[in-house]
Amino acid sequence: MEASNVALVLPAPSLLTPSSTPSPSGEGMGTESMLLLFDDIWMKLMELAKKLRDIMRSYNVEKQRLAWELQVNVLQTQMKTIDEAFRASMITAGGAMLSGVLTIGLGAVGGETGLIAGQAVGHTAGGVMGLGAGVAQRQSDQDKAIADLQQNGAQSYNKSLTEIMEKATEIMQQIIGVGSSLVTVLAEILRALTR
């Protein structure tokens, strides 16, 4: 990085002062003016680094909050799925018990004809209960699919946020690198001036 490039990017009023030290572009620039320019550039770099640090901190807090809310939402959907599956199982079990009770009850009352009628009524009741269980199971499967989608979305979202944070860290390192380069250039200039 040449000093003239820095001066062109960030002009300072102190560049207008007369000097005995010529710059690479042929204009005069005093040692004090150059030091003030480097100091100004350094201060601006540090301000940018501090702002980026603060943004990264608040971003990280927000990222954690959003990730937590997504995980809670996924958990709630999964709990709903478990409840729906349990309800389907209860309906199926109730249908099987009702079928058995009707078969035994009508069989005891009506003999062989009652047993056949009991089985028919029991199977019909079991079928109706099975239909209700199927509806509940369908709802459970839909809720599970939604929970899986939410889980995948939460993971993808979290990955995207992490990648953004990595980019911000990379930018912070570049700012620090530019600052180090600036210090090196200043040291070289001061060494050249003291010869």
From Swiss-Prot:
Coiled coil: 44-80
Main location group: secreted
Location of the protein in the cell: Secreted; Cell surface; Host membrane
Keywords noted in UniProt: Coiled coil, Host membrane, Membrane, Secreted, Transmembrane, Transmembrane helix, Virulence
Residue spans crossing the bilayer: 90-110, 115-135, 170-190
GO biological process, one term: protein secretion by the type III secretion system
InterPro entries: SctB2-like
GO cellular component: cell surface; extracellular region; host cell membrane; membrane
Disruption phenotype: Disruption prevents SpvB-induced F-actin depolymerization in human macrophages without affecting intra-bacterial SpvB protein levels.
Membrane topology: Multi-pass membrane protein
Function field: Component of the type III secretion system 2 (SPI-2 T3SS), also called injectisome, which is used to inject bacterial effector proteins into eukaryotic host cells. SseC/SctE2 and SseD/SctB2 are inserted into the host membrane where they form a pore and allow the translocation of effector proteins into the cytosol of target cells. Required for the translocation of SPI-2 effector proteins. Required for systemic Salmonella infection of the mouse. Essential for SpvB-induced actin depolymerization in the host cell cytoplasm.
Assembly notes: The core secretion machinery of the T3SS is composed of approximately 20 different proteins, including cytoplasmic components, a base, an export apparatus and a needle. This subunit is involved in the formation of a pore, called the translocon, in host membrane. May form a complex with SseB and SseC/SctE2. SseB is required for correct localization of SseD/SctB2 on the bacterial cell surface. Binds to the chaperone SseA.
Family that this chain belongs to: Belongs to the SctB/EspB family.
Protein name listed in UniProt: SPI-2 type 3 secretion system translocon protein SctB
Organism: Salmonella typhimurium (strain LT2 / SGSC1412 / ATCC 700720)
